[in-house]
Amino acid sequence: MREYQRLKGFTDNLELRRRNRATVEHYMRMKGAERLQRHSLFVEDGCAGNWTTESGEPLVFRGHESLRRLAEWLERCFPDWEWHNVRIFETEDPNHFWVECDGRGKALVPGYPQGYCENHYIHSFELENGRIKRNREFMNPMQKLRALGIAVPQIKRDGIPT
């Protein structure tokens, strides 16, 4: 059994924490065409993706080229997207941050009627020396369905106390 290593809390690695937090803040502030450069915030083989998909498997984009193509698609399909009500949480690990926020913007996804998406998000950022290694995005998939004009199934909750 591994011995538990006690961390120093949030007072260790202050310069690394500052650098990593600045990257997370920059990522969350990016809007419009600026998002086309978001891949530059990642390590070369870094990845980002949505962990709440209809398949139950994450949709992951790995490497600068894949992340760049994703940004182009996002710019076309969600042109005015913005994060707001952003709250950034540090952890005991100076290389791991969590973000809770809301997102909103037009949804112009091919094959679906034009819509508007508003959702609540949780992001996990794993970083290395100020660059993102992995960004995982979690949100309510029912809100995504509504934004795309897809009927949302009704879940029966008979017997659940209210």
UniProtKB/Swiss-Prot annotation:
Pathway: Antibiotic biosynthesis; phenazine biosynthesis. The keyword Repeat does not apply. Induction: In liquid cultures (aerobic), phz2 operon is induced by quinolone signal via 2-heptyl-3-hydroxy-4-quinolone (PQS). In biofilm (microaerobic), phz2 operon is induced by quinolone signal via 4-hydroxy-2-heptylquinoline (HHQ), a precursor of PQS. Keywords: Antibiotic biosynthesis, Virulence. It comes from the Bacteria. GO terms for biological process: phenazine biosynthetic process. Belongs to the PhzA/PhzB family. Involved in the biosynthesis of the antibiotic phenazine, a nitrogen-containing heterocyclic molecule having important roles in virulence, competition and biological control. PhzA2 (operon phzA2B2C2E2F2G2) has a role in the biosynthesis of the phenazine during both planktonic growth and biofilm development, and in host infection during biofilm development. This is Phenazine biosynthesis protein PhzA2.
